[in-house]
Amino acid sequence: MADTEDDIIIDVQGLRTAFGDHVVHDHLDLQVKRGEVIGIVGGSGTGKSVLLRTILGLKKPDAGQIKVFGIDFETLTPDERRHQEQRWGVLFQEGALFSALTVAENVQVPYREHLQMNDALMGELAGIKIAMVGLRAEAAKLYPSELSGGMKKRAGLARALAQDPEILFLDEPTAGLDPIGAAAFDELINDLKHTLGLTVFMVTHDLDTLYATCDRIAVLAERRVILIGTMKDMLASDHPWIKSYFHGPRARAAAASA
């Protein structure tokens, strides 16, 4: 059965992005279904993070159209855009926590920016989000410099979830984590998806994460999406890069542990 318009939460058509004469994407098409976890993979320089940032509006496309929630954000006023952007949360690779703020204060940043809310309510909501991502209550008072790598990821995720987003954007969420920490983060993403009904758009190179979390995978190569499908579709592909990536030694280890 064909997907209806309501099923598609992110719709990228004919995207072209470039930095000067260097073209990153050309005629790139991608549709993300509501409620799925989609993993974006590709070789170095294929523009995985550029695609994420372009969808977020942090880079202007040179051609093509991007719709999120069925809306072309290029048609919105700045106020309308800010309102719609509250419907998604973002966790960048570096976490982007404010070093001078505690974990709780970091989580409260979106409330202070977008909502008129008293301190007691902000503190209560921040506590809920901190618990939701598996951090202990004591972590609320800690500063980023006092956190482990895994705790920083979870604190950043708590802030991304602050306003109950419909879409969660993740840029290399398990980068820098040890295998145990990465597996725990994968489990958390699965739990949040099922509990909150999230759509998750994830740039990752982590094969274990692809196996553990993704409903579908989109492969970037040759300036576009060359294949989108399930892990089974990836394993059946004869494309040289896909074959090398999904059938190499690391892939076999990931498959064995899945």
PLM region descriptions:
Residues 72, 119-138:
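Conserved ABC ATPase "signature" region
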Residues 164:
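Conserved catalytic motifs of ABC-family nucleotide-binding domains
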